[in-house]
């Protein structure tokens, strides 16, 4: 399993979030999940990195960078780049 500090900001009703989580699990990529509907600070963070929009899924990496609505392949490539 690829282990890295990876957080996915989601909502319970987001189909894109479910798709990404399923794909990451299938690729054995570990992640933490934060539902922005239940965490005001998380919702504010997501808005701050998405031009004021609370767009999910938003993924935050260990280096502080983010991707919005990425594919599992994009997440995997970013993790490889961060790992150097």
Swiss-Prot record:
CDD domains (UniProt xref): NrdH (cd02976)
InterPro entries xref list: GlrX_actino (IPR011915), Glutaredoxin (IPR002109), Grx-like_ET (IPR051548), Thioredoxin-like_sf (IPR036249)
Domain Glutaredoxin: 1-84
Keywords, alphabetical: Oxidoreductase
Parts of the chain that traverse the membrane: none
Pfam families: Glutaredoxin
GO BP: cell redox homeostasis
PROSITE patterns for the chain: GLUTAREDOXIN_2 (PS51354)
EC identifiers of the protein: 1.-.-.-
The organism's place on the tree of life at top rank: Bacteria
MF term (GO), any: oxidoreductase activity
Protein known as: Putative glutaredoxin Rv3198A
Organism whose genome encodes this protein: Mycobacterium tuberculosis (strain ATCC 25618 / H37Rv)
Lineage of origin: Bacteria, Bacillati, Actinomycetota, Actinomycetes, Mycobacteriales
């Amino acid at each position: 399993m690829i282990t890295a500090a990876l957080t996915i900001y989601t909502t319970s009703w987001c189909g894109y979030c479910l798709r990404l989580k399923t794909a990451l699990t299938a690729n054995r990529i570990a992640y933490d999940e934060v539902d922005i509907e239940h965490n005001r600070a998380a919702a504010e963070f997501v808005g701050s990195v998405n031009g004021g929009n609370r767009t999910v899924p938003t993924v935050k990496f260990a280096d502080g960078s983010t991707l919005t609505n990425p594919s599992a392949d994009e997440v995997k490539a970013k993790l490889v780049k961060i790992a150097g």
